[in-house]
Regions:
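Alpha-helical transmembrane cores and adjacent cytosolic helix/loop segments
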Residues: 1-199
């Protein structure tokens, strides 16, 4: 590896760390905002999105830990941990959304939830794109996989936003728990990809 290559790699690593620290900070703030909004609106979608933020914090911590070490076993462990985080999220959302739909539970409107999920969707899509580019440049599968976690976070934010807007505007209460099923689909797909690759 030349000096120029080493400098380029160091710059990419710094970018990777910066993206993960930004994600951590955003999701820590998100847990506080979503906790208040979910309780006030009694919304399963906002509660589930808060759990997703907690899992995203864990996934970012895994990547920071992995980037601080060497490749090989640390990458394999990192990918497995992210896979387990996906599994926890999928099980929670599947169970919670099903219970709420079966019970016919009606959440309240949440202006705070609408604003936060709209801004979060834009932020997560931007961070996910940055992680994907940086992960490819570093040939780092953990950063690339966590980038997909962040992308799913953005998709969930958009789905929750749609559910909140439909509930507030049209009274479609079922759109709130139905939003949880969107993430379950993507989470299961990522779990299969991570573990079928033999990590």
């Amino acid at each position: 590896m030349t000096i120029a290559d080493d400098q380029a790699r160091r710059a990419l690593l710094r970018r990777g760390f910066a993206l993960e620290y930004l994600t951590l900070a955003w999701n820590v703030a998100g847990i506080a905002v979503l906790s208040v909004a979910a309780i006030a609106a009694r919304s399963v979608a906002l509660a589930g999105f808060g759990l997703d933020s907690l899992i995203e914090i864990g996934a970012s911590a895994v990547v920071i830990w992995e980037l601080s070490g060497i490749a090989g076993e640390r990458q394999r462990r990192g990918l497995r941990l992210i896979g387990y985080a996906f599994a926890v999220l999928a099980v929670y959302l599947l169970a919670q959304s099903s219970v709420v739909l079966a019970a016919g539970y009606h959440p309240h409107h949440s202006v705070t939830g609408i604003i936060w999920t709209a801004v979060t969707a834009a932020a997560m899509f931007t961070l996910a794109a940055g992680k994907a580019r940086t992960g490819r440049a570093l040939s780092n599968p953990v950063l690339q996989t966590e980038g997909r976690v962040t992308m799913i976070d953005g998709i969930l934010a958009a789905a929750v936003l749609l559910g909140l807007v439909l509930n507030a505007g049209l009274g479609w209460w079922w759109a709130d728990p139905a939003a949880g099923y969107v993430l379950v689909f993507y989470a299961v797909r990522e779990i299969r990809e991570i573990f079928s690759a033999g990590h």
